[in-house]
Amino acid sequence: MEASALLSRPGESEWLQLGDPPVPERLLPKGPGVVIGSGGSTGGRRLCLQPAAHLDRSAAATADWLRSIGIDPAACLTLNPLPMHHVSGLMPWWRSRCWGSPHAPLAPDLMKRPEALVRHCSDLPDWQGRVRLLSLVPTQLARLMGQPAAEAWLQGFAVIWVGGAALPA
């Protein structure tokens, strides 16, 4: 289920638990938030408790940074090939939600097929006319590099965030 649907369900726990095993309710901080996995790229999976207010502040700080380099966050299209049950997949969606801008999830298999990826993205309704942002992990970036169609696609982004592990030297 999409995180946006879960976050809007009234009467449910204030904490959306996207990680396993679930954290007992008595251990959760006050206020709404997300329990999510982190650290998968380095092997040591851990659960993170992310209060919604912290996620909102992170999105606001990122918006401030984008504005400082001349990009209006509300005018962006954020593409996201990362799973929502990881911090790196949740944050692009969360930022888009806070900025009032579109978020386009990308199926992970598209990242392995550059021609299909380019076709898919060019068919997105917001592809033309919006500043494009992308989040990926080093493995995805390494797969795309050296492939002309993928490199041309990457060059169409104003910002590419790479996280989750160190970049190869």
Annotated model-derived regions:
Residues 33-60:
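Conserved AMP-binding A3 loop
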Residues 108-116, 121, 127-169:
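Adenylate-forming
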Residues 60-75, 85-130:
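Conserved AMP-binding/adenylation subdomain of ANL enzymes
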Residues 20-37, 71-77:
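Conserved pre-ATP/AMP-binding loop-to-beta segment of ANL
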Residues 56, 85, 141-142:
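Nucleotide phosphate-binding site architecture
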Residues 38-41, 78, 93, 134, ...:
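Conserved S/T- and glycine-rich ATP-binding loop of Class I adenylate-forming
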Residues 1-26, 160:
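ANL superfamily adenylate-forming
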